[in-house]
From Swiss-Prot:
This is pH-response transcription factor pacC/RIM101. Residues 1-77, 96-122, 294-347, 474-527, 560-593 are annotated as: Disordered. A motif (YPX[LI] motif 2) lies at residues 534-537. It comes from Candida dubliniensis (strain CD36 / ATCC MYA-646 / CBS 7987 / NCPF 3949 / NRRL Y-17841). One of its GO terms (cellular component) is cytoplasm. The lineage of its organism: Eukaryota, Fungi, Dikarya, Ascomycota, Saccharomycotina. Its main location: cytoplasm. Transcription factor that mediates regulation of both acid- and alkaline-expressed genes in response to ambient pH. At alkaline ambient pH, activates transcription of alkaline-expressed genes (including RIM101 itself) and represses transcription of acid-expressed genes. It comes from the Eukaryota. The keyword Repeat applies. It is found in: Cytoplasm; Nucleus. Belongs to the pacC/RIM101 family.
């Protein structure tokens, strides 16, 4: 009776199915197992559980339903289904033909549709190629078959062949195996190796010791020794490099396996200078020598005057000092522009202000050169401003006599009085500003008969200005008795007409016993009414009844309190030669420049204590300026009168010498 069917079919089984079960179990006579192995739960998952229910041992035990149900459950488990292909392959090797049920058993086999079909259907199919993930299950599960005594041992060689078949299949096609043909992701992510840089040739730098010799030829196998590098160089060029005309030209350098190859003979001979300590090109200005002429030409530029390396530190300091002096002179000139005294006025007053910002250097030089023409323009401007322009245009036609007389009469009425008042003061100030801004050139004019009237007018105006100036000065002294008179501080005139005051000449005698009164007056005038004083020597002098000697007669060994100890020359020379102390020297030069700026700022020709004096609306400084302006016009007019008188006297002499008088037509 067959119990390898569904449990419901087992209940309806009869004795007719017994023959079928016995026939099925005849093919498994080679495997013998104990009954306890069929009931074991661990063996239920093994492939041997498929055939254990059909073994003779189970049939001898009366076909227990427990064992039949256990084998049936093991046959339907998922693990058994996954291993079913391998088991069927093993059974096909032992069976000569496929199992075919008899005709009498067809109703029973049709009723059992699940288990027999799942067991017999893989027998008609060949092993198919599985995915590699499933193939790992078979490769990693050989332990189930090794524990079987005969059944597993017979299956083991076939199992290895079966495992080798997918591996050979993958190796042949190369789809899934990670072989050398397909790079991995790590290999793709790796950076390509850096290119190897070619070997750079380095050459030995020639030193002075290398130029002493002897010199050995290192060309290939040549070992000739020479005394001078010139002979070695000629040997290389003639014997080793050769010439094309001699059919021995070699353009490859073989000096210590150098291997440099050139195209022309000139190139290889120029390359040989790298190996030979030869410097035939010498500098005429220094002791340096060079291998190539272009190197010498490049070096010669460093000896140019405008090259930065040529300028030593002392020269750079000298240039800075010159620039600083020019800057300080400009500052001093600007300050002197506000220090114009009355003694500077006369005819040279309007020659231009040296420090005035309105004038450039060229125009200022031109005014100094053309001083006479500029003075002529000043005089003409003053005369025109005081309505004396008609006297420079004498009548040339007879019909114009009445017009000239009437215009002269009108001019006389238009002229202001010769008294110096506030109107004349404002007019001269306006004229002063106009002359400082505009300087057109005018031709000298010949004055007519009115030149005497002009001279008389400006003479009276000059006298009026002098009186006003003296009255204002005395009034200022009365208001400020402790202040010296403005006339003494600023001398009115100087007969020599110099732009700068002359220095005093100090004699060997004492100050009290002067040789002449004129010498003493000159000292007083040049030093604002007091005798000059000098810094005292910082040491005690022996007292004697005789008057002390002037400072010029003293020895020059003392140190004044106004002097400053100088630095030693050696320290300055050493610091100038040292180029590493440039920054410190720059700081020192900057501080010294600032000190010089402060000292120059303190210099001023004008006494700061002298304030602007204004009395009754008149500025005392402007009054002195106007006095010099009128005086310059008066001097010029007197020169013109003198010149005209000379011309008239010459004409009278010529008229006396003539035999016949001339007749003038009206």
């Amino acid at each position: 009776m067959n119990y390898n069917i569904h449990p419901v079919t087992y209940l309806n089984a009869d004795s007719s199915n017994t023959g079928t079960a016995e026939t099925t179990t005849q093919h498994h006579h080679g495997s013998k197992k104990s009954p306890s192995s069929d009931i074991d739960v661990d063996n239920a998952t093994s492939p041997s559980s498929f055939t254990s229910s059909q073994s003779p041992h189970i049939n001898a035990m009366g076909n227990s339903p427990h064992s039949s149900f256990t084998s049936q459950s093991a046959a339907n488990s998922p693990i058994t289904d996954a291993k079913q292909h391998l088991v069927k392959t093993t059974t096909n090797e032992h069976k000569p033909a496929a199992f075919t049920p008899s005709v009498g058993q067809q109703p029973a086999s049709q009723t059992n549709t699940t288990a027999p079909q799942s067991y017999t259907q893989p027998a008609q199919q060949l092993p198919t190629q599985l995915h590699p993930s499933l193939n790992q299950v078979y490769n990693n599960q050989p332990s189930y078959y090794l524990h079987q005594p005969a059944y597993g041992y017979q299956q083991q060689p076939l199992h290895q062949e079966y495992n080798q078949q997918p591996q050979q299949y993958h190796d042949h096609h190369g789809y899934y195996a990670n072989n050398n043909n397909i790079p991995s992701i790590n290999e793709l992510n790796q950076k390509p190796p850096a290119p190897v840089k070619p070997f750079k040739k380095t050459y030995k730098k020639i030193r002075d010791e290398d130029l002493k010799g002897p010199f050995k030829c290192l060309w290939s196998n040549c070992n000739i020794i020479f005394e001078t590098p010139e002979i070695l160089y000629d040997h290389l060029c003639d014997d080793h490099v050769g010439r094309k005309s001699s059919n021995n030209l070699s353009l490859t350098c073989l000096w210590e396996n150098c291997g440099t190859t050139t195209v022309k003979r000139d190139h290889i001979t120029s390359h040989l200078r790298v190996h030979v300590p030869l410097k035939p090109f010498h500098c005429d200005l220094c002791t340096k020598s060079f291998k190539r002429p272009q190197d010498l030409k490049k070096h010669s530029k460093t000896h140019a005057e405008d090259h930065p390396k040529k300028l030593k530190k002392a020269q750079r300091e000298l240039m800075k000092q010159q620039q600083k002096e020019a800057k300080q002179q400009q500052k001093l000139a600007n300050k002197r522009a506000n220090a114009t005294t009355a003694s500077d006025l006369q005819l040279n007053y309007y020659s231009g202000n040296p420090g005035d910002g309105l004038y450039d250097e060229a125009s200022r030089k031109r005014r100094y050169e053309n001083n006479s023409q500029h003075n002529m323009y000043v005089v003409n401007s003053i005369l025109n401003d005081f309505n004396f322009q008609q006297m420079a245009q004498p009548p040339q036609q007879p019909g114009a006599v009445s017009t000239a007389v009437s215009s002269e009469f009108t001019t006389k009425r238009m002229k202001s009085g010769s008294e110096y008042n506030i109107d004349v003061f404002n007019k001269l100030n306006h004229l002063d500003d106009h002359l400082h801004h505009h300087h057109p050139q005018q031709n000298p004019q010949q004055y007519g008969g009115n030149i005497y009237e002009a001279e008389k007018f400006f003479n009276s105006l000059s006298n009026s200005i002098d009186m006003q100036y003296q009255n204002m000065s005395s009034q200022y002294q009365q208001q400020n008795p402790g202040v010296a008179s403005f006339a003494q501080q600023k001398p009115a005139q100087q007969t020599n007409g110099q732009l700068y005051p002359s220095l005093p000449t100090i004699g060997n005698g004492s100050y009290t016993t002067s040789s002449s009164s004129s010498h003493k007056e000159g000292l007083v005038n040049n030093h604002n009414g007091y005798l000059p004083s000098y810094p005292q020597i910082n040491r005690s002098l022996p007292y004697s009844g005789v008057a002390q000697q002037p400072p010029s007669a003293l020895e020059f060994g003392g140190v004044s309190t106004y002097q400053k100890s100088a630095q030693s020359y050696e320290d300055s020379s050493e610091s100038s030669d040292d180029d590493d102390d440039d920054e410190d020297d720059d700081d020192y030069s900057t501080s010294s420049e600032e000190e010089l700026d402060a000292l120059f700022d303190k210099l001023n020709i004008v006494d700061k204590n002298v304030e602007e004096v204004t009395i009754d609306g008149f500025n005392l400084k402007d009054v002195a300026k106007h006095r010099d302006m009128i005086h310059s016009v008066l001097v010029y007019l007197r020169k013109q009168i003198e010149q005209q008188e000379k011309e008239k006297s010459q004409e009278q002499k010529d008229d006396v010498n003539q035999l016949y008088p001339t007749i003038t037509a009206f």
